[in-house]
Regions:
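An anion/pyrophosphate-binding glycine-rich loop and adjacent beta-alpha core
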Residues: 384
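Hydrophobic or amphipathic alpha-helical targeting/insertion segments
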Residues: 82-129
Length: 779
């Protein structure tokens, strides 16, 4: 079966609402919120991971036990109460699960990891983790020691029931029979199945697979049936009890065999609506045969986001970026540099592990280990998508080989000899290379290049293509016709816990691309008034103010610190540069305290805000009405101006939303509370839940007249969406004038205003009150 159509009797939700479950918002809080979500029009509550995680974890992706619901998140009692409430209200539940890794920040909290460290390769949990014991001389390397650390900072604790090694607050187990009278901590450490090493040594010596480069998240081997069963028994118990109807798979690209994993999961949960957090590059499709409904929606986000940009503006935006910042590198240059940086540093251990596997498989290969490692690095750097799934994606490997050989002709021989090994599906070499390319792409591009190439940062979004620009309504329609045919049950989204910016920040950033000299002149003055050693980073900072507006200075300082360290040009996480960082923080302070800079920014923010509202409502309507299952990220039914995590995981004021929704007695005005966005969201979600038959097809509706390019309109089979795009250009050109569209046969009512329409509708009338219209057929 093609992905996108569930082969089972899965109950596909009409929409989902994502909640971040944690200590300060446990499952009981979700249960209390359920009636509001039901009133909003949602059909499924979509939960972040709820299995036991590292104590205090705000996100829950660092699972320490698969056996139970996290007590901090409300425990089994909280889960059952939420399940009962959801059932009572007719709501489904979707859970987020993490098959790729476990949290090992504190070994004492993770029984499987503790026993692995204590008993080594003979541990009953040795098959759980992906450890290269040979590379560590039979020991697992734990890069937890500080810069100046040595064995003499370790201490021996024999006060408990079993002896432990201590390094400050870190605790480690001791193998039986390895403590002799008079031993110091260093003597005991030398006899363990693990070796504590300085954190900087991880780049070369790390010998267990991690989630990306996060030492505290150890990869697990769900490809082993026993590990799959043990790590999924609890989740499948919820499914069997009828408490869970949907599953979201975190990071499938980390798995050794994603297709095999998904087959096993779909067989164990045949009635579940399954989506995968898979990021596809432009033009890339989900692998055929995956038994899933689709992705978690980053592909849809990109289709909607680019609609807010005018392809005709790209040349000017690029030219002015180069002039303002002095950065004349292309997006492709930034991708190459970002990927090479991480492949040579934080993910180099993965390259070395594949190199060892190559040497083991082909001892007589006529290339040095150094050449093999460099050839593997070049192939990974040149890989055009996150990963292949051999034999699917074989052409990606060939293309990467061509590119790699053209960049490093002296490695052509090694590259050519590696190709048969890398394309031999199911072998250790092939699998590890596929796992590595995804990590190198994520860290080198999303977490590095996205912070360096700052031409129009609203396009630097997960699933997006910062090197592309806008798209036309015709291109959008083509993508939706394909989506309706191939992925009608895939999730769609505009904001997640992983997006670089919330949808409403991006809506305002899109306005900057329309402003032309009004924006570039302001940016020039800001860059001059508060100098930062990197003008490209300064340009990112001032765009961030324009997009987020006057958020608290604490939030902006925290964002600036994360962004400049991710960019790793001038400062970084490992070796922060005090001078560079002080200059950036000074610029942030001056935005709030310096009268000239503050008023420059304030005038800009005030000017773009109404057009930002227009873009916010347009993209929301398009996302909620387009083919797929729309997700609403917690709180984003009102305007929410959030930056990258942890900023986008702040507590949500649900009481405000509840009161606004209950208090509606008609269409609210367009203003700063965002009530209009809540009104729009609730009208469309309720319609999708109550009249699914009106959302079964996709027909582009041609807009004609002088401002035709400023609208996008489509009919889903009885529900019609009409949205404004490029509002600045529309106003400058004199408004809608006699632009209009021919409604499909029948009589329609705009669910947002209550107005009746039929036949040819003039957009000046249709969009008089709001920049959007949502019409349903009444006859």
């Amino acid at each position: 079966a093609e992905p996108g159509r569930m082969t089972s009797d899965a109950t596909v939700p009409s929409s989902t609402y994502r909640l971040q479950i944690r200590g300060r918002f446990p499952l009981s809080a979700a249960a209390e919120l359920a009636d509001y979500l039901q009133a909003l029009g949602v059909s499924a509550i979509y939960l972040s991971p709820i299995l036991q995680a590292t104590s205090g974890s705000d996100h829950g992706y660092d699972i320490t036990s698969h056996r139970q619901v996290d007590p901090e998140r409300g425990g089994e009692q909280g889960r059952l109460a939420l399940a009962a409430t959801a059932r009572e209200l007719g709501l489904q539940t979707v859970v987020d699960i993490v098959p790729n890794h476990m949290g090992v920040a504190d070994a004492a909290q993770n029984e499987t990891w503790w026993q692995l460290l204590r008993d080594g390769p003979d541990s009953q949990y040795a098959a759980w983790f992906d450890v290269d014991w040979k590379a560590g001389d039979g020991r697992i390397k734990l890069p937890v020691l500080g810069d100046d650390a040595s064995d003499d900072q370790l201490s021996l604790d024999v006060t408990g029931p079993s002896a432990e090694l201590r390094y400050f607050e870190h605790r480690f187990p001791i193998a039986e029979g390895t403590v002799k009278p008079g031993d110091g901590a260093a003597d005991v450490h030398a006899r363990q199945h693990y070796q504590l090493i300085g954190y900087r040594r991880a780049d070369d010596e790390q010998n267990y697979r991690r989630f990306f480069a996060v030492t505290e998240l150890a990869g697990i081997r769900v490809e082993d049936p026993a590990v799959f069963d043990a790590s999924h028994a609890e989740i499948l118990r919820w499914v069997a009890a009828g408490d869970v109807q949907g599953i979201r798979i975190d990071h499938p690209d980390g798995l050794a065999d994603p297709a095999g994993y998904l087959d096993r999961l779909a067989a164990a949960a045949p009635d579940c609506w399954i989506t995968v957090e898979k990021i596809t590059e432009p033009g890339e499709r989900l692998p055929a045969g995956w038994p899933v409904a689709g992705t978690t929606g980053y592909d849809a986000l990109a289709e909607v986001n680019t609609l807010l940009y005018d392809p005709a503006a790209e040349a000017e935006v690029s030219r002015r970026y180069a002039e303002l910042t002095g950065d004349r590198r292309t997006w492709a240059d930034h991708v190459e540099q970002g990927k090479r940086m991480v492949a040579d540093t934080i993910l180099h251990a993965e390259i070395l592990r594949i190199t060892r596997a190559v040497r083991h498989a082909q001892p007589v290969l006529p290339h040095s280990d150094e050449d093999v490692a460099q050839a593997l690095t070049e192939l990974a750097v040149g890989f055009g998508v996150y990963r292949s799934y051999h034999p699917i994606g074989a052409e990606q490997l060939d293309a990467a080989a061509e590119l790699a050989a053209s960049r490093r002709p002296e490695l052509r021989g090694a590259i050519t000899n590696l190709l048969p090994l890398l394309s031999d599906a199911g072998t250790e070499i092939s699998i590890r290379f596929e796992q590595a390319t995804g990590a190198i792409m994520a860290k080198g591009v999303e977490d590095t290049a996205y912070y360096r190439y700052n031409r129009a940062v609203g396009l630097n979004e997960v699933g997006g293509d910062p090197g592309g620009f806008g798209s036309t309504p015709a291109e959008f329609h083509a993508a939706q016709l394909q989506r309706q045919q191939l992925l009608p049950e895939s999730m769609t989204t505009l904001s997640t816990h992983d997006t670089k910016r919330s949808e409403d920040v991006r809506a305002r950033l899109a306005v900057l691309a329309e402003l032309g000299e009004r924006w570039y002149g302001t940016a020039e003055r800001l860059l001059a008034a508060a100098p930062i050693p990197s003008r490209a980073f300064g340009y990112l900072l001032w765009q961030s103010f324009a997009g987020a507006g006057w958020i608290s200075s604490d939030r902006m300082h925290a964002y600036a610190e994360k962004a400049m360290r991710e960019a790793a040009e001038g400062t970084g996480w490992r070796d922060p540069d005090a001078g560079f960082e002080a200059a950036v923080h000074r610029a942030v302070d001056r935005a709030y305290d310096d009268a000239e800079i503050h008023s420059l920014l304030d005038e800009l923010i005030t000017e773009i805000t109404p057009d930002g509202w227009s873009n916010s409502l347009s993209q929301k309507l398009v996302q909620l009405a387009m083919p797929g299952v729309p997700d609403v990220y917690q709180g984003s039914e009102l305007y929410d101006y959030s930056l990258v995590d942890p900023d986008n995981r702040r507590p949500v004021d649900f009481e405000l939303r509840r009161q606004l929704l209950a208090g509606f007695d008609g269409p609210p005005p367009l203003e700063a509370t965002g009530a209009a966005k809540l009104w729009l969201t609730s009208r469309v979600l309720r319609e999708r839940r109550e009249h699914p038959e009106r959302f079964t097809s996709y027909t582009p509706l041609p807009v004609t007249g002088p401002a035709a390019e400023h609208a996008v309109a489509f009919d889903r089979g009885g529900a019609v969406a009409v949205a404004t795009r490029l509002p600045v250009g529309l106003r400058r050109a004199g408004g809608w004038r006699d632009t209009g569209l021919e409604l499909p046969a029948g009589r329609y009512v705009d669910q947002l205003t209550g107005e009746q329409h039929s036949g040819r509708a003039r957009l000046a009338d249709l969009l008089r009150r709001y920049p959007v219209a949502f019409l349903t057929r009444t006859d």
